[in-house]
Amino acid sequence: MLELAHKLADSDAKFFGGWVLAGVEAHIHGEAVKLENNVLLAKERKAMIQVLGTAADGSVAKELRVFLVLPKRTLGTKQADAVAAAGECVARHVFTAQEIADYVAYTGDENIIHKGEHPIVPGLCMAAWLECELQLKELDWKLSFLSPVYAGDELRVYDDGEKLAAYVGAANVFVIK
């Protein structure tokens, strides 16, 4: 996941500064020898970018599709709706500003929302952490990001058998199907 995020950062940082990750499709089924970015959609306030990883035989080994939106309002001004968590808590973590800075340095993600005194945790940083935490070698995920997670927030991930749902307090912040 991290190598896909690193390649994604090759996208035009000036164009995508301030944009937020609304959703991700991630498919990992082996090692990729070549990665390439493809802009599938680029509009005034929404974009879709694909990172495609091919194996030595030319088959698709990894794919990441990100859905980005440019918010009309300032982030953090609307509280996420409170929802009761269902299922078993399978992972929890508090991301620090240093972890975010390390992720940004490694991937090259220069988005302004991941910097400053109270940075937003990059969505792909959370996805990569969860991939490692669950010790996954392969995955097929559709992630929907519902609300930002900030440095210092405790993120808890629950598995209800059909999906993974992440919470900060009582707010559902992302879902993985």
Residue ranges and their predicted role:
Residues 2-3, 14-92, 149-153, 158-177:
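HotDog/MaoC-like acyl-thioester-processing domains
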